[in-house]
Every structure is written in structure tokens, then in C-alpha cells.
Regions:
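Acidic, metal/ion-coordinating pockets
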Residues: 7-11, 15, 19-275
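Short, Lys/Arg-rich N-terminal segment immediately upstream of the first membrane anchor
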Residues: 1-6
Length: 275
């Protein structure tokens, strides 16, 4: 359709009119205020990471105070009873042996120790007559004196262990077995198992005891005996006994009766054995 000039002018006016209405709506027409619709902003919820609750620091557990146990230990030897000692004891005792006078100078000395160990170098029993050098046997009453002095641990392995043969071993072991329960002896071992071990617990500390000898003055292990000494050159048996006992005690005490008679000089055998 073709529009004439007047039609074009009318269209232009309408277009302008529409534009005026739009502008007027925004800016206000004829100075009249235009109220815009109220806008109610909605709160925006944002998930924020939650701060962890502070963890209370635990109080440190105090280290337990270790319990310290102390044992005072003495070792004495050799208790070798010659004729003059037991004859004097018999004279003092009359109808028995009284060895107290022989040890009078030691009275009270051993009270300062918790454990008193002694090498009893002679067989002790009442089956054999008392005898001195060279084949010793000591009356059993000597152990009353030794016990009263404070001795509780006795080593029986030394060069005089076989002085009275198998019967001497048996008589001596029977005597020691009759002593009070707190007496511990070692040195005569079961010759099949070697496992009759000696233990003692003092102040919560467990001791194990082993004792050996270098020789028995040339006397062999007596025939007919089930018990005997272990010689220091029997390394295999010694190693086994030590391995057996170590797990069962806090302290393992091993005594070795060895050396050259009549001198304090250390010989090669002593040095090698100790090392």
C-alpha cells in the first residue's frame, strides 16, 4: 500500500508519541511523581563452611615414677675348716660343736647386707667323722653358726667337693636340704639333666646362682652318684645352664672356684675363663 505524505506524517507523530509515553513514564510527565512498585529483597542464603569446634588439648599423662629396688650383696670365701677349728669348737661345746667363737669377729658384720653368699669349701654333714686336710668333712653344727651370722646362699662346688666320694655328696646334700627354706645352695648338679637350678628373690629382685670348679684335686666324679660338679672347661654345659636361667632371673651370679693355691696372682686359665 502506498502512503501519501499526510499518512507518513501521522505515522511519525505516533512513533514520537509512543516514544514520549515511554520516556514520560520513566521521568515523570507534567511534573507528576511516578510511584514505582516496592521491591522486597529476599535474603540470600549462602552455605558457609562450618568452623570446627576447638578440640581441648588433653592433659599429658605423667610418666610413672620407676620403683628403684636396691640389694646389698656380699660374697665370702673360702670357708675351709681345718682340724684346729673344729677341735676348738668341740672343746667349747663339750658334747657338741660350738663354732661361734671362730666367727666372733664377724658377728654383726653381715647385717648390713641383704644377701650373703659363701663358698663352703668343705663337705658339711653328720654322717662322717670330722676331718681336716687333705680330705675334709665338717660337722653339721657349723651351719647353725653360719646361718646366725646371716649367710643364706652357699656354693658347694670346689676342689674338695669329692673328698668323701659319692657318700659324702649324698650326706652333704641331705644336710643342706634340711636347712630352713630361705637357704639356697648350688654346685652339685643332676648329672643327667644339669637343671636343678637355684633361685632367690630379695626386695623384688630375683637372683639365679651357678657355681663351678676348675678341678677336684685329681679326684674323678665318684661312681654311683647321681650328682656332681660341673668343671669350668665344660663350656657346653655351662652355656646351656646360663641360657636356661637368664630368662628366669633379674641377676645371674656365676661363681668360679679356680686359681693357683697360695697366691693372689691371676693365672692364664683364670684370665681366659673370665673372658
Amino acid at each position: 500500500m502506498r502512503m501519501n505524505g499526510n499518512d507518513l506524517a501521522a505515522c511519525a507523530v505516533i512513533a514520537l508519541g509512543v516514544g514520549g509515553v515511554v520516556v514520560g513514564s520513566l521521568l515523570g510527565v507534567g511534573n507528576q511523581a511516578v510511584t514505582l512498585p516496592a521491591v522486597n529483597p529476599q535474603p540470600v542464603v549462602v552455605d558457609m563452611p562450618t568452623e570446627p569446634e576447638p578440640t581441648a588439648t588433653p592433659e599429658p599423662t605423667p610418666e610413672p615414677t620407676p620403683t628403684v629396688e636396691t640389694v646389698h650383696f656380699s660374697a665370702t670365701g673360702d670357708d675351709l675348716i681345718h682340724d684346729g677349728i673344729f677341735l676348738q669348737a668341740r672343746e667349747r661345746g663339750g658334747d657338741h660343736y660350738d663354732f661361734d667363737a671362730a666367727y666372733a669377729a664377724m658377728q654383726g658384720y653381715y647385717d648390713q647386707f641383704d644377701v650373703n653368699w659363701l663358698n663352703q669349701e668343705t663337705l658339711v654333714n653328720d654322717e662322717f667323722a670330722a676331718s681336716g686336710y687333705p680330705m675334709f668333712s665338717t660337722p653339721g653344727e657349723i651351719t647353725d653358726t653360719l646361718y646366725n651370722l646371716g649367710f643364706r646362699v652357699f656354693s658347694l662346688s670346689n676342689n674338695h667337693s669329692y673328698d668323701k666320694g659319692a657318700a659324702g655328696i649324698e650326706a652333704s646334700m641331705a644336710h643342706w636340704a634340711a636347712m630352713p627354706d630361705d637357704v639356697v645352695t648350688m654346685g652339685f648338679y643332676n648329672l643327667e639333666t644339669y637343671d636343678n637350678y637355684a633361685y632367690q628373690t630379695v626386695n623384688g629382685i630375683t637372683f639365679g646362682y651357678l657355681s663351678y670348679t676348675e678341678h677336684t684335686n685329681g679326684l674323678p666324679t665318684p661312681s654311683g652318684t647321681d650328682y656332681g660338679v660341673v668343671y669350668l672347661d665344660d663350656h657346653e654345659t655351662i652355656a646351656k645352664q646360663i641360657a636356661d636361667m637368664r630368662p628366669n632371673c633379674d641377676v645371674l651370679i656365676v661363681s668360679a672356684h679356680m686359681g693357683t693355691e697360695g697366691t693372689h696372682e691371676v693365672n692364664d686359665f683364670q684370665r681366659e675363663t673370665a673372658q
